[in-house]
UniProtKB/Swiss-Prot annotation:
Residues 209-224 have a biased composition (Low complexity). It is found in: Nucleus. PANTHER family: HOMEOBOX PROTEIN TRANSCRIPTION FACTORS. It comes from the Eukaryota. Transmembrane segments: none annotated. May have a transcription role in testis. Its main location: nucleus. Residues 1-45, 136-224 are annotated as: Disordered. Gene3D superfamilies: Homeodomain-like. This is Homeobox protein TGIF2LX. It comes from Papio hamadryas (Hamadryas baboon). Residues 35-45, 166-179 have a biased composition (Polar residues). GO terms for cellular component: nucleus. The gene is TGIF2LX.
Amino acid sequence: MEAAADSPAETRSRVEKDSRRVEKDSRRPKKDSPAKTQSPAQDTSIMLRNNADTGKVLALPEHKKKRKGYLPAESVKILRRWMYKHRFRAYPSEAEKRMLSKKTNLSLSQISNWFINARRRILPDMLQRRGNDRIVGHKTGKDANATHLQSTDASVPAKSGPRGSDNVQSLPLRSSPKGQMSGEKIPEPGSAPSQKLTMIAQPKKKVKVSNITSSSSPEPVSTEEYADFSSFQLLVDAAVQRAAELELEKKQESNP
């Protein structure tokens, strides 16, 4: 009955009020969910973080695989030192393995495996680098001694050779035939026998010296030296003949 009693003007006013309320509600900002209100940049950063986390998770097993089988550097140094000291017998006994395991904090199986690999890879380089192989060193020592002896044997004639050549070269300077050939006077008949003996004795001594030098030195004596000795012998013979002639002349004069 009340609705029927309402005038059309009142109904119109109510409708207008309802329409205004609807417009106001439409003009007000709507409260969206937090996922919808985020910007695209924030969305990309979240995606990158998620990918990085997954990459780290995937990379952990590979990192563990790479480090698997590697021993600590300090323990490897200790094992290398022991191998270098015992490089000619790189087979540790059980007691030595226990001692090394205490020093390196490694198990006996790890130490034995390391030595098996090191004997194939590290030990040959140690021996070649240092040259400490006993057989090779023994041979090289013998070769060095042989070469040393050869060098000393070769140095003996080399040292004695120049001395012999000096003696041979000094002989003509001390000898007198060149002076006689250059124009010196023949000795007087009174002193001829004594000079004759000295002159005959001198070539013998000189010949002996020349023989010694020729045997000690490898260089042969030249033929010019023999020519000088032959001319000297001729001069000696001439002097002897002249002295004999002078003695005969004196005897003839003393016994007319």
